[in-house]
């Protein structure tokens, strides 16, 4: 039932020993391991030296984050006040939030585009915005236009930062 034949190649202690004793094969393995370790060391040193450039690049990426309850749009964060305030109180409240009333200097292509946000996140209404006018008047934003309004009138407001 069982054969006494020897199958060459399956178990051959002489060949196995010959491979392990071959010093040139071991030298090649050491050289390859040395190359791998060397490239890893060079990569680590390079990353350590140029780490500041890596951080700078990440800081320049266009991802921005807004605080809770703020809306991000076009690299600007907006806060839509849901209570009515007169112009001065709205402006002061925005300052407490480390922001300003949305203004014509905000990095927004067109301030009236915020109306789309007001419809999405609040409701269509009049909003105080900061715009250069004479002393006792300011501008309210409504229906894609600017309208003069007395500063003592209470309206909703939009802060930006």
Curated annotation (Swiss-Prot):
Region (Lectin-like): 66-160
InterPro entries referenced in this protein's UniProt entry, alphabetically: C-type_lectin-like/link_sf, C-type_lectin/matrix_domain, CTDL_fold
Membrane disposition: Single-pass type II membrane protein
Glycosylation sites: 89, 98, 104, 110, 116, 130, 136
Subcellular location: Host endoplasmic reticulum membrane
Disulfide bridge partners, by residue number: 66-77, 94-159
Sequence ranges on the Extracellular membrane side: 52-161
GO biological process: symbiont-mediated perturbation of host apoptosis
Subunit-level organization: Homodimer.
Recorded family membership: Belongs to the asfivirus lectin-like protein family.
Protein name, per record: Lectin-like protein EP153R
Organism: African swine fever virus (isolate Tick/Malawi/Lil 20-1/1983) (ASFV)
Source taxonomy: Viruses, Varidnaviria, Bamfordvirae, Nucleocytoviricota, Pokkesviricetes
């Amino acid at each position: 039932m069982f054969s006494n034949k020897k199958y060459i190649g399956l178990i051959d202690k002489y060949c196995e020993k010959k491979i392990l004793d071959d010093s040139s094969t071991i030298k090649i393995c050491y050289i390859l391991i040395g190359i791998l370790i060397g490239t890893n060391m060079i990569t680590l040193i390079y990353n350590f030296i140029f780490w500041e450039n890596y951080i700078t690049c990440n800081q320049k990426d266009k991802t921005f984050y807004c605080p809770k309850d703020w809306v991000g749009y076009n690299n600007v964060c907006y806060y839509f006040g849901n209570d009515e305030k007169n112009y001065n109180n709205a402006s002061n409240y925005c300052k407490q939030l480390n922001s300003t009333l949305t203004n014509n200097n905000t990095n927004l292509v067109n301030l009236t585009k915020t109306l789309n946000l007001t419809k999405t996140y609040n409701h269509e209404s009049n909003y105080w915005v900061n715009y250069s006018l004479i002393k006792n008047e300011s501008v309210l934003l409504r229906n894609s236009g600017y309208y003069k309004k007395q500063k003592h009138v209470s309206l909703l407001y939009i802060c930006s930062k």
